[in-house]
């Protein structure tokens, strides 16, 4: 028994690396990574020894407390739901909101040092790079099957048929920021080698984000690039800064010139100026629905039925996607302003922590996640729930104080 426990304890670090690697991978790998981590913590005995006091866990300044509370409210919301089948499926999708922070409470502190946290970030960067490379190669192969190369095959939905572009774009933006600030000390190579690796990855992420043509991705990578340029000029890497700026401008110009023909987005209609106005009208109608039941909402299981009826009554479009296209509104429809308050509290607590530690680059990453939630019901899909849950736990760990006063390099 002691041998099994010792062996399991040695597997905790590889399991966490695997979890980071699987964040951007298909759902099967996400589920397997969480299950393996839970089993390893159980076999090692760590699952019986919480590493935080009750005061730390239930601290109102703890953003993970509000994240877990949000899930509990979704569970309570089942009490006034009539569609229990949909509600149970929804709770299953949202399970990582409480499961991942719960497991996080039992991870030994030696596995949450700054050095190891950056290794987990490197695993995430590796995973997203593999996914993007696979999508790009698949798109190029599809494009070459035509008589003349079809550039649309590596644009937007054609590039990511199995992945939602906005989710993939958000993960790529975060990966770009993490790549620039990642010390990469564990690679044990020269500074020039590290610069080359970072430059190649960041340029690759920039190119793929432009190809994805996601509004969230466009804003996110603009923020990421500005942060990178600011730090390059601040460190007086003038030549590298101008080379990077020239690459970004040239990249945007080239892809823009090659993709002038309109193509269809996920709502099944070509890009035009009416999309934004229709979306604003859509939000206005949802707010009217919320006003009818603002405190408790309509219940965790009845959200889809309420929005389906709204689509039918108002005849708004978006016929294939029966959600609010905004996580803050979606949460309010489901469990009222109490749920909205919990979701907002998660971001406010994180923002205060990161601002206090002067981790402004990570604060920008948090803002990009918030932007995703303002344009997508990101906690209604496994891709969004899984990514956000791990991202929040990583941000909490990286912003914790410790005796050695470890700090993030360059941030």
List each model region and its residues:
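N-terminal signal-anchor transmembrane segment
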Residues: 1-49, 71-81, 369-371
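Alpha-helical transmembrane segments of multi-pass inner-membrane proteins
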Residues: 19, 116-150, 162-233, 353, ...
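Transmembrane alpha-helical segments and their membrane-water interfaces
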Residues: 21, 43-52, 78-132, 371
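Transmembrane alpha-helices of multi-pass inner-membrane enzymes
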Residues: 36-42, 177, 181, 362-374, ...
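Perimembrane helix-loop-helix junctions
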Residues: 42-50, 221-242
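A membrane-periplasm/extracellular boundary helix in multi-pass inner-membrane enzymes
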Residues: 133, 211-212, 232-271, 284-292, ...
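Long extracytoplasmic/lumenal interhelical loops at the membrane interface
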Residues: 270-280, 284, 292, 296-335
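Hydrophobic transmembrane alpha-helices and their immediate junctions
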Residues: 334-370
């Amino acid at each position: 028994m002691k041998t099994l426990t010792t062996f399991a304890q040695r597997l905790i670090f590889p399991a966490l690396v695997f979890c980071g690697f699987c964040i951007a991978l298909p759902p099967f790998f996400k589920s397997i990574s969480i299950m393996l981590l839970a089993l390893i913590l159980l076999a090692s005995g760590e699952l019986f020894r919480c590493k935080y006091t009750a005061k730390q866990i239930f601290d109102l300044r703890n953003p993970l407390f509000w994240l877990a509370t949000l899930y509990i409210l979704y569970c309570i919301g089942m009490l006034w739901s009539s569609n229990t089948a949909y509600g149970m499926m929804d709770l299953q999708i949202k399970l990582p909101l409480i499961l991942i922070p719960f497991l996080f409470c039992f991870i030994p502190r030696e596995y949450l040092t700054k050095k190891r946290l950056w290794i987990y970030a490197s695993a995430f960067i590796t995973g997203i790079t593999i996914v993007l490379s696979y999508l790009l190669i698949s798109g190029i192969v599809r494009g070459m099957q035509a008589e003349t190369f079809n550039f649309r095959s590596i644009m937007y939905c054609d590039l990511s048929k199995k992945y939602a572009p906005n989710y993939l774009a958000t993960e790529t933006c975060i990966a770009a920021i993490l790549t620039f600030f990642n010390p990469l000390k564990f690679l044990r190579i020269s500074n020039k080698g590290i610069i080359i690796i970072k430059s190649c990855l960041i340029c690759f992420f920039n190119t793929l984000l432009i190809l994805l043509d996601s509004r969230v991705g466009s804003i996110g990578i603009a923020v990421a690039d500005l942060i990178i340029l600011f730090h390059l000029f601040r460190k007086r890497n003038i030549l590298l800064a101008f080379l990077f700026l020239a690459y970004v401008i040239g990249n945007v110009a080239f892809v823009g010139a090659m993709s002038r023909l309109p193509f269809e987005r996920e709502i099944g209609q070509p890009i035009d100026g009416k999309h934004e106005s229709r979306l604003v009208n859509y939000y206005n109608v949802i707010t009217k629905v919320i006003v009818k039941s603002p405190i408790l909402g309509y219940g965790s299981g009845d959200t889809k039925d309420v929005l389906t009826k709204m689509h039918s009554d108002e005849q708004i479009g978006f016929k294939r996607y029966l959600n609010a296209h905004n996580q803050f509104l979606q949460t309010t429809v489901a469990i009222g302003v109490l749920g909205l308050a919990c979701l907002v509290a998660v971001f406010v607590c994180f923002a205060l922590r990161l601002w206090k530690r002067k981790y402004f680059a990570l604060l920008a990453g948090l803002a990009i996640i918030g932007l995703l939630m303002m344009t997508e019901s990101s906690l209604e899909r496994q891709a969004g729930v899984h990514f956000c849950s791990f991202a929040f736990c990583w941000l909490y760990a990286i912003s914790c104080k410790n005796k050695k006063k470890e700090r993030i390099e360059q941030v």
